[in-house]
Amino acid sequence: MNPEEAMRPLLMASEMMMFGAGLVALIAGSFLRRQRQWWVGVMAAAAQVGVIGVAVVQMVGPDQMAFEGAFSVDTATGVARIACAAGLLLIWAVAGAEMRASPREAETYALLMFSATGVLVLAGAEDLLLLVAGYFLASIPLYGLVGLARSAAAAEAAMKAYLMGALFGILLMLGVTILYGLTGATRYPQLAMTLSGAPAVAVAAGVVGVLAGLMFEAGGVPAHFWVPDAAQGANATAATFLTTVPKIGALVALYRLTTVLPDTLAWPVLIAVFAVISMTLGNLAAYWQQDPRRLLGWSTVSQVGYLLVPITVAGASELALPSLLFYLGGYTVTNIAAFAVTAALPGRRDLDSYRGLARTRPWLAAALVVALLGLVGTPPTAVFIGKVTTAAAAWDGRYAWLAVVVFVNTLVSLFYYLRWIIPAFGRPHETGDADQSAVQHWPARVAVLAAALSLLLGIIAGPVWQLVT
């Protein structure tokens, strides 16, 4: 039997470990006393360490296929696994106290790991049906996570996420149905051989449907409307997760799909348009925000635009995939650092309330500066390397105008991040609010750690680049 025709389930050990840990967390929550549910967190953290370990071991070996060629285990899958599991560990450290105070602690761990499993399935999918399964496995737990805060804003955000997810899920399935109807195949290698002979208009309709669905998961235009509301209304756990982890699977999945699309279809132009609109709209909308989390919600929309740039030149530049993977890793730790600062200061829900932070909490202010300037793309942070290499990939792939748009939008984004940074270094208010001055210590520590990781990834970019190439 051809290796690609074998099931080889052990190649998906990371995904099975993630999903199995979610099941254990869900069941344990029904039997453990409320005071003992911290064991679920220990088990979940151990599972993430296992996922990272398996991913590293499999990345050392050659690229392989599992489940009769439906799932690819390669460098992109390995990076997605490591970024996803490491992101979960940081998120749990940020929101550990919040989760322990919740009556749904075990269920929260379960929902996060179920959604993360869907993200990993998306990242390795080489089959349209597996892509659909990964989409819904990643999306459905998100709706519950957003609504866990039990507030009017969270309920509204959860409803928006559900409605948008259902709509774009339908578009995804419609696109998959069209592509299957045209080719009689769902595996990417078969699609690559048959799509070129299919009617271009029908192929375009199918591709647009699939792209729209993946844009919901990534949080980019045209499926971005729910992201700022969810980032603002959800609790710290859900807000940090939904603006970070789902992007990993969705964008790697989109990259894989574009590699099998026919050259006769102008799909790079479509993705380039989505990239420009996402980064521009996200930056312009973020400029007027006063709530830090809502600002970060719009910021994450703009980041999707930058991440779409290397996908635009997939197959046209050798820099495309490495730049995408490096950017995803750098964005993960940098975005978590920014949200960790907001979680450390839960009483400060507008930008002016951060006034004087550098004098009262200098380490937290330093983490905020590194995170926000990192999201801008300031050296020597990891996102700086990501943006430079994505722009270089666009230039190398003959999309020089797109590289120019990246640099212009990067400059524009600096202004609204400075609206947050400048008050932090101003004079503190004479009459301080006790709620505003209270600091959650674990999120503060994670903010400093994640900011340091962002700097470290930028400093050792050379060796890391070799690993993702």
Curated annotation (Swiss-Prot):
Function in brief: NDH-1 shuttles electrons from NADH, via FMN and iron-sulfur (Fe-S) centers, to quinones in the respiratory chain. The immediate electron acceptor for the enzyme in this species is believed to be a menaquinone. Couples the redox reaction to proton translocation (for every two electrons transferred, four hydrogen ions are translocated across the cytoplasmic membrane), and thus conserves the redox energy in a proton gradient.
E.C. no: 7.1.1.-
GO cellular component labels: plasma membrane
Translocase among keywords: yes
Pfam families: Proton_antipo_M
Name of the protein in question: NADH-quinone oxidoreductase subunit N
Organism from which the protein derives: Mycobacterium sp. (strain JLS)
Catalysed transformations (reactions): a quinone + NADH + 5 H(+)(in) = a quinol + NAD(+) + 4 H(+)(out)
Membrane-spanning residues: 9-29, 40-60, 76-96, 105-125, 128-148, 162-182, 201-221, 234-254, 265-285, 294-316, 327-347, 365-385, 402-422, 448-468
Keyword terms, alphabetized: Cell membrane, Membrane, NAD, Quinone, Translocase, Transmembrane, Transmembrane helix, Transport
Membrane topology: Multi-pass membrane protein
GO terms assigned for molecular function: NADH dehydrogenase (ubiquinone) activity; NADH:ubiquinone reductase (non-electrogenic) activity; quinone binding
Lineage: Bacteria, Bacillati, Actinomycetota, Actinomycetes, Mycobacteriales
BP-aspect Gene Ontology terms: ATP synthesis coupled electron transport
Localization terms from the record: Cell membrane
Family statement drawn from the similarity comment of this UniProt entry: Belongs to the complex I subunit 2 family.
SUBUNIT field: NDH-1 is composed of 14 different subunits. Subunits NuoA, H, J, K, L, M, N constitute the membrane sector of the complex.
